[in-house]
Each structure stands twice: as C-alpha cells, then as structure tokens.
Amino acid sequence: MDYLLNYADQYALDSIYNAVYPLARDNIVRQSISLFFLTWFGGMFLYLTFASLSYQFVFDKSLMDHPKFLKNQVFMEVLTALQNLPGMALLTVPWFLAELHGYSYLYDNISDYGLKYFLCSLPLFVMFSDFGIYWAHRFLHHRYVYPRLHKLHHKWIICTPYASHAFKSADGFLQSLPYHLFPFFFPLHKLTYLALFTFVNFWSIMIHDGKYISNNPIINGAAHHNGHHIYFNYNYGQFTTLFDRLGNSFRAPDEAWFDKDLRQNEDVLRVELMEYEAIRNEVEGDDDREYIANSAKKNH
C-alpha cells in the first residue's frame, strides 16, 4: 500500500493537503485520511468497473426471469454496495496503517525471499484466505449473527455481478479479514499484495455472475455460489470446495443449472423452489422480499 500512497501523494495529495490543511506525509492523521479515501474510491472503481463489465458481457440475463429475482434488484444491489463501501474502507484503514508502519511481512524485492518462495506464496495466500473466509462465512450464518450482519447479502437469491459487494460493511470486512491477516503471518511481495487485492475483488464478482460454465469438483465457481444463495447452508468457501468438503457443508450444483433450457423448466423450478422455501423459512422465518414475478402478477 505504500507504493500506492506514494504515487497518490506525489501526483495529487500533496497539492490537496497543501491547499486545504498542510500535513507531513508521515503524519498518521494524514495517512489515515488518505488511506480511507484511496480504499473507498479504489474499491468503488474496481467494483463498478468489473461488475459492470461482467453484467454487460458475462451475466446471463435470462436469470432475471427467475421467479425469485427481485423487483428493482440491480438498482438495490448497486445502492447497497455504494452505501457500505465507505464503512468497509474505514474498517480496513487500521490494517493498511499497520502495513505502512512496518508491522507486517510485506517486502519489496523478490530476491528478499527468493523466487521459489515468491511462487509458493501465491497458492499459500489462496489457501489461507479460503480457510479463513470459510470460517468467517460460516460464523456469519450462525443463527444469532445471520439476521444482524449477513441477511442483507442473502436478500439476493438470484444474483447479478453487482451483488458481489452488496452487504453490510461489517459483513464485508469480516470476509475480507483473512486477506489482511495473511501478510502479518507470512512474507508477501508488496506489488503481489496489491494484485491479489484486485484479484479477490474480481473473484467475488465472478462467483456472482450467473455464468455456470464449469462444475469443477475443486474450484468454487458461480454455480457453487449460486447453490449457497438458494440453499443457504452450503458452499461457504470462496476459492475452492476443499473446506466445505472437510466441514461437511459441500453441495454440488444442481445439474440442471448447466443446461439453459432445463434450468427454466417449470418442473425443475418447482422442485428447486420447494426446497428453497423450506430452507429459507427455517433460516429466516417470514419473507419480506418483493419478487419481480409477484410484482408482475399484481399489475395484471
């Protein structure tokens, strides 16, 4: 993060602070303010850019005809994300500050730990994050925690890419915590850290994009995560299915999801919706969602 902050200082922030309220670059108040806005606007840029590209070119828009797609859902997803990104940025600032002040194992040169470790650190990051997110996500589904923190994200049953960041600030922060913890336990190249931070944002969008290409037994793809949103209590992992398998929470995607015609079959949908309603009622009780199908019926 120091690379990004230095560039921002050099090309924009020095001039802004000098004009508004002069503070030295190493002033912790200035650093905190700068990191907050960089994280907020950077996160917003990544979210709106990647989610919009995915929505335009990848997302299967026939899913918007699903009976559990919500009225004004895309607008609500974007609004929810934009309302909560500042809070997520605020919660993230202390971690970036700690990294900036040398409390992490972030390093500058690949030669510091060697090429072999550098290459090994990439899958290590993925597995560490996947393990941490699995347990954070499972914690968020605890019956006392779910209605207070995570229920908002499960408002979206049939997701669009914009649902990827549409959750409460504390929810998003808890699920991102393993990313920030990693460099405090293991050495990680600084530029790689920034690249991985971008990658995890992209991955979050990808597993919400509704493009059910692969039923890979190892990789947690969009179909697996769709199963999580429909059936609630399965597939908590982010990148792989490993920890769901070990934690007995893995559920293979429904085969019908990989066949566009079969996916829209009334009999297939009836079975899917019966199970969805049973699980949703157990997890949430009364349903306060306004589905587009119900709205259309009211208008006729």
UniProtKB/Swiss-Prot annotation:
Chain ranges of the Fatty acid hydroxylase domain: 123-248
Intracellular or extracellular location(s): Endoplasmic reticulum membrane
Cofactor(s), names only, from the UniProt record: Fe cation
Short motif (Histidine box-3): ranges: 225-229
Induction summary: Expression is anaerobically up-regulated via the sterol regulatory element binding protein sre1.
Membrane topology: Multi-pass membrane protein
Main localisation: endoplasmic reticulum
Pathway: Steroid metabolism; ergosterol biosynthesis
Keyword S-adenosyl-L-methionine: no
GO cellular component, one term: endoplasmic reticulum
Pfam families: FA_hydroxylase
Transmembrane portions of the chain: 33-53, 78-98, 117-137, 180-200
Cell cycle keyword on record: no
UniProt superkingdom: Eukaryota
EC number(s) reported in the record: 1.14.19.20
Domain comment in the entry: The histidine box domains may contain the active site and/or be involved in metal ion binding.
PANTHER family: STEROL DESATURASE
Protein name: Delta(7)-sterol 5(6)-desaturase erg31
